[in-house]
Design a protein with these regions (language model features):
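Catalytic alpha/beta core domains of metabolic enzymes, predominantly
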Residues: 214-348
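Short, small-residue-enriched loops and turns at beta-alpha junctions
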Residues: 37, 41-42, 71-75, 129-131, ...
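Short beta-alpha connecting loops at secondary-structure transitions
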Residues: 132, 207-209, 237, 265-273, ...
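A mid-to-C-terminal "edge-of-domain" accessory segment
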Residues: 1-36, 291-469, 505-510
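N-terminal capping/small domains of soluble enzymes
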Residues: 1-104, 367, 372-375, 379, ...
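Alpha/beta enzyme core
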Residues: 3-4, 30, 41-65, 81-87, ...
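A conserved regulatory-domain signal marking ACT and ACT-like small-molecule sensing domains
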Residues: 447-453, 463, 469-521, 530-531
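Mixed-charge, glycine-accented linear interaction segment located at domain edges/termini
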Residues: 521-524, 528-548
Length: 548
């Protein structure tokens, strides 16, 4: 690896940093850039229908600032801005944002697109990075700064073209992470001198990690230094715009907020140039999982995903935090066992969510518990038992869980694939209640006095009708005696469990019998019926069919 072709970047030496001792206790201001930064990164940019679907979804989720396009860069973006203004589709409490480069023709075209809007953020930018000044523009620092201040002056002068509109300004020194920190500050302060913000009408200074160039802690150092030194701090909103080139955009945003930033721009599930923008959904749900109101409504995360996938024509990864198909799923046996016990411990109602391996309750994002546990060859008894409990109301005794999980594992090892809940049920019924069982209980008559219980049971044995009579100290013991005397079926009942059924069957009771053969081997039988007596007798017959 040619690592010697690269060098580390340290934006500032900040030995007295304070951000590590801060905590995230409230949500920043959110701005979605799905319709602009996200859209420009797509293989196939959104058509009007997809843009509208995304815009509607962002409003439903509670975004109050939405960057809706780059109207001077393309006719479709211009038309979309005009559509949502002319059709009155922007709620009173939502501010749209439009992007423009610091070029006079583009700024004028941008203002033309805004006639009739009640409030708008005009976001103008130019690249200030050392590399782009040298390689792209061939300009010195003063020349690049003048581009920014000239744009600010023009923007202010064009306010008169839309007297009904409240204008808010945002300036980005693009490639902030590749710009000398003192120079980025100098340019931002110069822009602020033109805009003349106040605490009531602040200027947004957006500090993009246009390319993520260093670790999140260094980004936080840069943000804290900037917040300390920027003029008019009480009249400035410091905004973050992290990209994910190093895979740490979420961490960079979180540490940047700790360092003093007020606002974050990002996209749903991180769509954006190259490796993407910061994922606002992950940021919001990270706050949520720590007991902080995210100030976004993500109670139907699957709908948000479906809209994003439709609009972007890109899939959301199965492992994507909070939203991926598998993020609430455990295949590992030990994980499944811990989840099963955790779910039982908190019950249906709880004050505080505490379940192993599940950082949040899936129901809080609109998910169900259905996919929490899925079974493959890595799974153990806990996962199988959990699915039988949730799908069919069965509470298998622990020893029976071990026995049956081996049956399931044999199948998963043979196929090498996941096994579905319905397939697990098929294995269960085939094992314990097969339709073609050798012995089948047709009916029974039980009588008892103070000394004994007697049973007359009508059976079908290998297709032949058989009557079994037995006597014992209870119905199970009596049936065992009858089977032993008349059919030479010899085993004893080692353990017995029963419970009412709550789901998944027309039967109302289930019984489990652990049988022990004369050689010391053990196995289980299961019976289900409308009465607990019949269920217990069915369990004995099940064990008799499975005798080893």
């Amino acid at each position: 690896m040619a690592f010697d072709k690269y060098r580390s970047t340290v934006p500032v030496e900040l030995s007295d940093r304070t951000w590590p001792s801060q905590r995230l206790e409230r949500a920043p201001r959110w701005c979605s850039v799905d319709l602009r930064d996200g859209n420009q990164a797509l293989i196939d940019p959104m058509d009007p229908e997809r843009k509208m679907a995304m815009f509607t979804q962002l409003i439903a989720m509670g975004f109050k600032e939405i960057e809706v396009g780059f109207p001077s860069a393309s006719q479709p973006d211009y038309d979309f801005v005009r559509t949502i203004i002319e059709q009155g589709l922007i709620p009173e409490d939502v501010t749209i944002q439009v992007l423009t480069q610091c070029r006079e023709d583009l700024i004028r075209r941008t203002y033309e697109s805004l006639h009739g809007v009640h409030r708008v953020i005009v976001h103008f930018y130019n690249s200030t990075s050392t590399l782009q000044r040298r390689v792209v523009f061939g300009m010195d620092m003063d020349g690049v700064k003048k581009i920014a201040t000239d744009a600010a002056t023009l923007c202010k002068s064009l306010e008169s073209t839309s007297p009904e509109t409240e204008f808010v300004y945002e300036y980005s020194p693009e490639s902030f992470t590749g710009t000398e920190l003192e120079y980025a500050l100098e340019v931002c302060d110069a822009v602020a001198d033109v805009i003349e913000p106040t605490p009531e009408q602040p200027l947004i200074l957006n500090l993009p990690a246009t390319v993520e160039m260093y670790t999140p802690n260094l980004y936080a150092d840069a943000i804290e230094w900037f917040c300390r030194h920027v003029q008019r701090r009480d009249s400035v909103l410091v905004s973050l715009h992290p990209h994910n080139d190093r895979g740490t955009a979420v961490a960079a945003a979180e540490l940047g907020v700790l360092a003093g930033a007020d606002r974050v721009e990002g996209t749903l599930f991180g769509n954006g140039e190259r490796t993407g923008n910061v994922d606002v959904v992950t940021l919001a749900l990270n706050l949520f999982s720590q007991g902080v109101d995210p100030e976004l409504d993500i109670r139907d995360i699957d709908k948000a995903r479906h809209v994003a996938e439709y609009a972007n024509r890109l899939p959301v990864h199965m492992r994507h935090p909070y939203v991926g198909e598998l993020v609430y799923t455990a295949f590992s046996g030990s994980h499944q066992d811990a989840i099963k016990k955790g779910m039982l411990a908190i019950g249906d109602t709880y004050d505080l969510w505490e379940v192993p391996y599940l950082p949040i309750d899936p129901k809080h994002t609109g998910r169900t518990y259905e996919a929490i546990i899925r079974v493959n060859s890595q799974s153990g008894k806990g996962g199988v038992a959990y699915l039988l409990s949730t799908e069919h109301g069965l509470d298998l005794p622990r020893a029976m869980q071990v026995e049956f999980s081996k049956q399931v594992q044999e199948l998963t090892e043979q196929t090498g694939t996941e096994i579905s809940p319905s397939e697990i049920w098929d294995v269960f019924t085939t094992t314990y209640q097969p339709e073609n069982a050798t012995i089948q209980l047709l009916s029974s008559e039980v009588t008892a006095d103070q000394h004994n219980t007697r049973i007359f049971a009508q059976l079908i044995v290998a297709g032949q009708h058989v009557t079994v009579k037995g006597e014992g100290n209870g119905p199970i013991d009596a049936l065992m005696a009858g089977l032993r005397n008349e059919m030479d079926v010899d085993f004893k009942v080692r353990d017995y469990h029963e419970h009412a059924l709550t789901a998944g069957s027309e039967a109302s009771a289930v019984a489990y019998v652990e049988a022990e053969g004369t050689d010391g081997s053990t196995w289980w039988g299961v019976g289900m019926s409308s009465s607990i007596l019949d269920a217990s007798l069915e369990a004995v017959i099940s064990a008799a069919n499975r005798r080893r």
